[in-house]
Amino acid sequence: MDPIELEQWLSAHPPALADVIRHVAAACARISRAAARAPLAGQLGGAGSLNSQGEPQQRLDVLADACVSQALSACTHVAGWVSEEHADVTVSPEHGSGGAYLVVFDPLDGSSNVETNVAIGSIFSVLPHLFRGTPASAAAFMQPGRRQVAAGYAIYGPSTVLVLSLGQGVHMFTLDPDAPGDAARWVLTRADVEVPVSTTEFAINASNQRFWEKPVQRYVAECLAGQSGPRGRDFNMRWVASLVAEVHRILTRGGVFLYPRDSREPFRPGRLRLLYEAAPMAWLMEQAGAAATTGTGPLLELVPDALHHKVPVILGSRDEVERIVTYHEDPSANVSWQLFKTRSLFIQPQA
């Protein structure tokens, strides 16, 4: 059987939406090439500027943002977009009122890993433009994740893979590095991805343990207690500091990812951006049979109150996510840790 290419696959979907995905995929292919050539082209290191969140930008952050923005500017169906790198909405100069769709994106997730050559990626989501006929505004983006019509990411690692859902399962396309010239040839390499329901892997930044809520403390301690603890089996812990890399591992072999609420800044409920990080990944998880929550409710039900609204994120294999939700529902059941004291890596919380 001949391989199925992205262009052929998109032909079965609404033409306008397919065209949006086509433009995003082209931008991802350009970013992939730029990332691969970054050490040779002098594109490593800081850009000497800050993004909309006040975070230092890498040179590749700026380049990736330009790649996606240029691609969306050329798409007649996109009214406007929001990028992690900019505080406000960018209205399409040509199609700001007539475009049927809005796009949100993180142009280069995990960019702090660039110089160590760890996998990085681009995350995107497509929303309907509910106020079509008027220029795209911030209010138009205040939609729950359930309204997404497409979401995905590209991961730039040993191979470049575009992971995509248009609401009918999750599919993976690999970029052909031998395609002639500047052509971007994406080939379907995995269709209808399903995340295993159970897992023995979890991913969390353990250095923040002292700030976690008790339900998360309990969950991690039980995992670390291993076979002799209440779970009766051993777990492995992972942490890459790249949301794309963490999610890709979960889609490939299962697992659970936690970036929970913590007490460092009580006025901020989480660390990941809802529109262009949490919601797209939650959409992919649910499309692949997994689950995604804040700990107290489904991520896809949340309506952002700002373009860069941040939330806690727990996603992955359904059994583990549901267990963590149960722990949040009854904090009084988060029992003493003395049972695990000799096995835990963590200092026991004081009463």
From Swiss-Prot:
Entry's family note: Belongs to the FBPase class 1 family.
Annotated positions binding Mg(2+) 1: E84, D106, L108
Note on how the cofactor is bound: Binds 2 magnesium ions per subunit.
Coiled coil: none
Broad class of enzyme this protein falls into: hydrolase
InterPro entries xref list: FBPase_C_dom, FBPase_class-1, FBPase_N, FBPtase, Fructose_bisphosphatase_AS
CDD domains according to UniProt: FBPase
Residues reported in the UniProt entry to bind Mg(2+) 2: D106, D109, E277
Example of a GO biological process term: gluconeogenesis
Pathway linked to the protein: Carbohydrate biosynthesis; Calvin cycle
Name of this protein: Fructose-1,6-bisphosphatase class 1 1
Protein keywords: Calvin cycle, Carbohydrate metabolism, Cytoplasm, Hydrolase, Magnesium, Metal-binding
Gene: fbp1
Localisation: Cytoplasm
Organism the protein comes from: Methylibium petroleiphilum (strain ATCC BAA-1232 / LMG 22953 / PM1)
Pfam families: FBPase, FBPase_C
A GO cellular component annotation in the UniProt record: cytosol
Enzyme nomenclature, EC number: 3.1.3.11
Annotated binding of substrate, by residue: D109, G110, S111, S112, N205
